[in-house]
């Protein structure tokens, strides 16, 4: 069984090179401030109803330490979490939030260095009316996320590695990172130019 922390030293950029496009979230979900630390951990999926944040507030007491709580929020009008929720999640060992929606009190999360990736910030809180089963598959940033899938997020993007593919993806990504790290810029430029010129030749481009 792969320890999700093994992915912590791999950029989502490297992972994207060995994953399909439907395993990388869309660019609208971003770190909410510059310099946010990369996170990697098993997904604990949460779905919230429109205008409601009950299930994320419940999840912070149920998700195992080290988890990345991945939230399918129901709207882009209300916040699903604020400063205290982020602080409690951090204190309980949650690695971070990835939210297809909005949060509030971003300054508090930033001051505590608790990683939050979301679509933005709004001051209005959601309600607490709708109970939905926790730790079941969700869609976040256009990607299906199941419990235990590995989530890796940083300023480059957010990659989701299906749990069953984790070992194979890790091996491919480590090999890619090693190859890239050993290649000089001169070697890369030479190979890149040859490849581009060959593509242009096939396209009939002259110039």
Annotate each predicted stretch with a short phrase.
Residues 1-147, 161-207:
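Feature captures the catalytic cores and cofactor-binding loops of soluble hydro-lyases/lyases
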